[in-house]
Swiss-Prot record:
<feature type="repeat" description="WD 1">
    <location>
        <begin position="54"/>
        <end position="96"/>
    </location>
</feature>
<feature type="repeat" description="WD 10">
    <location>
        <begin position="771"/>
        <end position="810"/>
    </location>
</feature>
<feature type="repeat" description="WD 8">
    <location>
        <begin position="625"/>
        <end position="667"/>
    </location>
</feature>
<dbReference type="InterPro" id="IPR015943">
    <property type="entry name" value="WD40/YVTN_repeat-like_dom_sf"/>
</dbReference>
<feature type="repeat" description="WD 7">
    <location>
        <begin position="537"/>
        <end position="578"/>
    </location>
</feature>
<feature type="repeat" description="WD 2">
    <location>
        <begin position="132"/>
        <end position="172"/>
    </location>
</feature>
<feature type="repeat" description="WD 5">
    <location>
        <begin position="396"/>
        <end position="435"/>
    </location>
</feature>
<feature type="repeat" description="WD 6">
    <location>
        <begin position="485"/>
        <end position="524"/>
    </location>
</feature>
<feature type="repeat" description="WD 9">
    <location>
        <begin position="719"/>
        <end position="764"/>
    </location>
</feature>
<dbReference type="InterPro" id="IPR020472">
    <property type="entry name" value="G-protein_beta_WD-40_rep"/>
</dbReference>
<dbReference type="InterPro" id="IPR051242">
    <property type="entry name" value="WD-EF-hand_domain"/>
</dbReference>
<feature type="repeat" description="WD 11">
    <location>
        <begin position="845"/>
        <end position="884"/>
    </location>
</feature>
<dbReference type="Pfam" id="PF00400">
    <property type="entry name" value="WD40"/>
</dbReference>
<feature type="repeat" description="WD 3">
    <location>
        <begin position="181"/>
        <end position="220"/>
    </location>
</feature>
<dbReference type="InterPro" id="IPR001680">
    <property type="entry name" value="WD40_rpt"/>
</dbReference>
<keyword id="KW-0853">WD repeat</keyword>
<dbReference type="InterPro" id="IPR036322">
    <property type="entry name" value="WD40_repeat_dom_sf"/>
</dbReference>
Amino acid sequence: MERKSTLSSPGSSLESVDHSQPQLLHRYLTRENVQHLHQLFDQRKQLLPDELRAELFVLTGVRFSDEEFETLFMKINTDRDNFCQWDELISYLILGFHNDDPLAVQESLDLPISLDMSVKLGRQTYPVIKIEYSPMVSYDGTVNWSQGFWATSTQEAVINFWKRDWKHEKTGKAFSVDLKRAKTWILDTAVLPDLNYFCVACLEHELRIYDIIGSGFTLKIIVNRIPNPINALKYHFSASTRSKLIMGDYKGVLRVVEFYPERKEPFKFDAASTVTRLSFRDLLNGSYPQMECVDYGRLLPDIVRQLQFVEPTYSFLACSENDPLAPSGSRKKLYTSVIIQHLTKLDKITKIKVPKGVTCFAYDHVKDFLVTGGPDGELRMWDIRRPENPVASLSGHNAGVVFMFLQDGSQKIYSMDTKKIVKIWDVLNRILIQTYSQFSTTLYKTVPACAYYNDLNRELVIGANKVLSAPCCPKIPLEVTDGESHTQPISVLLYNPLFKVLISCGLDSYIIVWDHTMNRKLTIITDAHTQVVNGLLEQVQITAACFDPKLQLLLTGARDGTLKVWNFNSGSCMSSMSIQEGCEVTAVFWEPTSILAMGWNHAVVEFPVGTTGMDFPRGIDWQKLHSDDILCASVTHSEPKAIATCSYTGEIVFWLMETGQPYQRFNAAKPQQKIPVNAMTTKIGKPKRRSRMSVFMPQEQLRQRRLTRIVMPVKAEQLRQLTIHELLFLESRPMHPEVGTLLSSLDTGVIQVYSHHVDGGFLGSFNAVHMAGDRVVSMTTDPYNKFLFTGSYLGYVKTWLLEASFNRAALKMQFPFLLDDIIPGRAKRSVANQPLPWLLNSYQAHRNCITALSYIPATKLLLSASSDHTIRIWSLAGRYIGLLGSPVKWATIDADVPIPKEYGFRIPPDLQREVSFTTAQVLRGGERAIKLKSRILQEASERRRTEAVETYGQPLEDPIIKPEVFPYGYRAGFVHDAKMDYSFRETPIFEHLSIQNLTKLKVVDSKRVVEKVEGLDFSNDGDRIDTYHERNI
């Protein structure tokens, strides 16, 4: 490809164009180029490939190679009619911009609240009105949010304190100490973590402060005679500023009380009384120097509902609803609902007016982004720099909104209404993501609910008659795992060599197109297969998939028997069909003239391809030869084309692809005996659901330490039925009776070898597992059938050599598994007496079952999919590269060049500790991280001895012979050899050297020496240069 000029679209955010990817047309074409192409298509309606290629060269200056343009045109030509139309071209450009959008490719697969809620506290005696978490503050001012306690308050003045794991710690009662007939009615509470105090605002016009150090709950101070009851409290503490307690009362009056953070005991009490009483007027007048109170007056029209302090702007926010008792004529008037007041600059205030007022809000000071919710159930988004009108509104709640918070840099809004229904919103797209209603079905409808968002654990806690919690987009613990690729087990993993992308399908009904070189999601198809059950739309698990012969379309099969054809680049469904209602599809194949699908219907169903290539008439059932469900199948495209199918009972049937006629039949329990090819005469009923998908579920924790063999009776062995889990054709091998071309894996861990020739049959078998209870579930090979890759139920990946001639030394350098060990591992011991095939590699790639394998020959990469929802990339030698969909990034992989040895390989976090020695050796590339105790003690001893020599070594001594005897120092011929001491880790060389004292050497006149050297005559052979040394200079 040659690049003549670099063009960028006007207003494009891309500063430079990637010259190595000519298929990204949206990065090359300008707006004028697109308009020119539009006019050209209006005139010609459609373009041939050569015409489009010439036009793109004229517009962009990009010279495509034949292979590059063929791939590009196949991506554009979705109709597959060898003509390019305008809608196809513009759709391809739009998809290119969509793939470049970083927010589009980072779309989360899970819903924000995907896990079930958990019950923290059961039914409470008194409903909870306030939940708050208090961190632990050290004496030096260090705040530790991972250690703290929970505090729950009730209106009946009962305060409960709980540990971080919600175990009860203590209970306090905020009753009045005066003899009053009326009981205390709490309006709001606040924890003062840095002072170890608890503040209570009650309906008795009082503010009570309690000491909560240790197990006590002691009343210390009472601020009484407050003009109006305080309804809202918000406490803020920081090491850089004074601690502040913001208060809002029933009339909309706001006040701020400041404390001195440098004093550990801000309250000085009277020695004659255990409780200090202070009137509110004395607090305002400054009679109590430990606290300073500032009254900002009535800034809001009604009861203050929520408060928040913003430290960067040194201001606070407050909101209130409109007065419901106001006259009807004044209700239409807009009152101030939200205020942003600076603490010191009283004239610096921002007012926001909302109809009916505001009950709650969420504010992001970094983006100046404010979201408000009120009794009308509508969410309004504001830019506080322009508070006149909201930026946007979100409607969806059927009741008043009482709580909300922001998440992920103000990208998501969580809002809860009075009916305890939580809704999650996408701020950028302004759409509803999820509606979560489990809280409303668990809590009492008549009891108001309070909420608290724990930013540390990303957890929403809701309290009423119970205390419940639900994780909200929980963070991935990178020290334990790299994340997940799907939300449920992965069933299909395919590599498309045309587009050089990876496609995965899972039981979550997701189809994801991956750019595995950069760990990016290119396309996400959600709810690919669905069905309506009891009026609800439910997802259907995807169990099989394949590409069309041109590698442009994707065919998927689901558990309900439906088949769908997808354009995986655009995510559009192009056709749909079904083999039988309720029959799981276990294998699909797309041939040039037909589509073959099979599953629990016991037969192969053929859908002929219509004239247009996208219409599929009614399916035709082949001859029924299986007595049970078909579990897997494989196709060979070497002439003559054949297909092999196997059932749950171990039956293997070979079919001719062209005619659909069976020509061989075997049983895995007795592979040497050929079974006559006869049609099934018994009527097959409706298929029943089996536990076939158990490989995708969490497996048992097998604890067998060594492989054991159970000897069964001969009669029982003959009656045993063996299930075949996977079939694989070796297509590069010739069709010959003595050449093995089909591999079948049994549930005993044995792989059988068959020849699909008419005169062929069972040729042999070999053991492919080394753990008791394990079995091979997935298999794949390279195009030349040199390597065989097997994935087992326990998560092990093995690489086998299928060639008889090989270079053993070269393979040992390539595979660390082949290095000699002092004690061979179980994988090597299991194949010690098994000559062929040769085991090249064995390591644990996943903790759970490996459901699919895919090998990329160009880069020599092996990709494994597991029931643990992950897709991992491995090198041919077994080194771990990364996990698709993980937030952990790795260096970009070249799509056409094998990965270099200097690549920064890692070890999966879940495999760093509990793995076998063989797996650890493979994951480390042959480097041994374990040292013997004797070797460690020897190195420590040498280190101590060497450090002593280096630190306290003897100084250099003068030579014994005086310098006057030999004025020119020692001659080289008389210097004795130094005896070095090599017992240390570092040899002290200077201790054994004899160094001449240069300070007493005779100083030579250099000018005189140069003159004498110039006068030397070397013309005679008798003259020697040594004569100079014999003269007296």
